Amino acid sequence: MPTGTIILIVSIVIILIIAYVACLIVRKRNDNLLVALEERKEELFNLPVNEEVETVKALHLIGQSQVSFREWNQKWVDLSLNSFADIENHIFEAEGYNNAFRFVSAKNAIDSIDSQIDLIEEDIASIRQGLMELKEQEEKNSGRVKHALNLFDSLQEAVRENPDSYGETLSELEKQLKNIEVEFSEFVMLNSSGDPIEASEILDKTEEHMIALNQIMDRIPSLIERVTKDFPEQLEDLESGYRKLVEQNYLFTEANIESQFQNIRVSIRENTALIVSFDLDAAEAENEGIQAKIDHLYKVFNREIEANKEAVKISKNLPKFLEHVVQNTQLLDEESQRLNATYLLADSKLSRINQLKARLESIEIVVTESVEDIENPQVAYSILEERLDHSLASLKEIEEEQLVLADYLKSQELSENTARKKATLYINKLHTLKRYMEKRNLPGIPAEFLTNFFRTSDHVEALIAELDYKRINIEVVNRLLENATYDMNQLEELAYLIVQNATLTEQLLQYSNRYRSFDESVQKAFNRSLSIFEKDFDYQAAFEEISFALETVEPGVTERFVRSYEKTREAIRY
């Protein structure tokens, strides 16, 4: 055979072999896909949907719940009887295509089967979800029913065991419980007949009513206790206390006490009506208002009781204190009259003593009447206490002012005695200073000293003249004494200074002799200083002139002489 023919035959054989192998591979892959689809179908078919359907079916649902269950059940029946059978047929058909090497038909069949299984899987998931929701709704209703029953029983038990705690609201509470019982019966009927969806709506309303009623019942006992027990007891206590206080002659700043009692009773009745109508927020606010009215009356009564105690306490000592202050004022008046004959007393002080006398007269009237009113009061004790307190405070204030006035009167004679002694002393000092200056053997007395001496003498004489008046003005005396004292001190200091300057000048002039013979500046200073000393009598200028010259030739010499003089200075002896 020709070579070309052989090559062609070999090529055809090889192509056929390759095509056959490729077909085997594709068929194997399709077989695997079909096996996987068969397994998916079996997994879906083996899901416990039948058991779940039977479980929900056993709940005996009706109404809307039953309609939903029938829809899910019918859907499952269609799937289990028709859809799975169709898939089984399609798988068998696809296997035939695959075995016959009709791969395109097999591929289309496999894709169709896969889509069918996806749809069935979604349908089964929705069926199971729907069945689960029906079951959960039923179980939820059952749990809520139990809770609702327990709550309802607890409400009934609370009313049954503690009827007094609810007072006049009891009939309304029983009415509300009866309405809830009717609603609950309707719910139980629907739930028992297998309609949990509609029953759930009824249960929601019933639970809302029970929760609201439970909250109301929790608040009512405390409100009822206040209007039926607390307030009446407090009101009875107030009325009893009021009667006792009236029997003991108590009066009050408020004239409408009994009408306030009546207003509180009316408020209690009105608040009871609010509680019965379940307007509890308003009732609580009204309770606070009632308590405030009661507290106000307690405060009024306690204030009068405490005022009585305080008034009695003050009244025991106040008359004696008043008598003491009155006596002091009389003594001040007598003393002022006695002293006014000798001294010119300040009109303001005399006027103030008279004002105190008048003020004490009015206080005495108030105290006397108030003390008498304690046994048989004409006004409330709080008013009496206020009057007595004010009187006591006024008396203390007057007593303090009396001390000031007494010190003023006492100071008249003391000031006169002091001024007379000082005047006598200053006259003696003037004579002593005069002798002191004369004994210094000075060339002359400086004009400054003479001026101060005569001014001081005039002030002392003016002081003595003021003291010689028939009626002495102590204010003027004290002012003159102050001037004389100041002048006397100044004159004494001036005398010391003049004598010191004169003595030091003489000493320095003598000391300068050691320098005059050879130091012309010292000689000139000596001459000027001596001239000032003997002719002008300006001893300070003379001292400064010679000391300056000596300091030039012998620094520190002046300070040495000054220290020495201060150690041996002669004091003025009065």
UniProtKB/Swiss-Prot annotation:
Function statement: Negative regulator of FtsZ ring formation; modulates the frequency and position of FtsZ ring formation. Inhibits FtsZ ring formation at polar sites. Interacts either with FtsZ or with one of its binding partners to promote depolymerization.
The record's Gene Ontology cellular component field reads: plasma membrane; septin ring
Family of the protein in this entry:
Belongs to the EzrA family.
The chain's Extracellular topological domains, given as residue ranges, are 1-7
Localization per Swiss-Prot or TrEMBL: Cell membrane
Q: Which keywords fit this entry according to its UniProt record?
A: Cell cycle, Cell division, Cell membrane, Coiled coil, Membrane, Septation, Transmembrane, Transmembrane helix
Q: How does it sit in the membrane?
A: Single-pass membrane protein
Native species: Streptococcus suis (strain 05ZYH33)
Q: Which residues lie on this side of the membrane: Cytoplasmic?
A: 27-574
Alphabetized Pfam families for the sequence: EzrA
Stored NCBIfam families: PRK04778.1-4
Q: Does the keyword Membrane apply?
A: yes
Q: Name one GO biological process term.
A: division septum assembly
Q: Where are the transmembrane segments?
A: 8-26
| Protein name stated in the entry | Septation ring formation regulator EzrA
Q: Which residues form a coiled coil?
A: 105-189
Main localization, broad class = membrane
Quick check: keyword Transmembrane in the entry? Answer: yes
The highest taxon in the source lineage is Bacteria
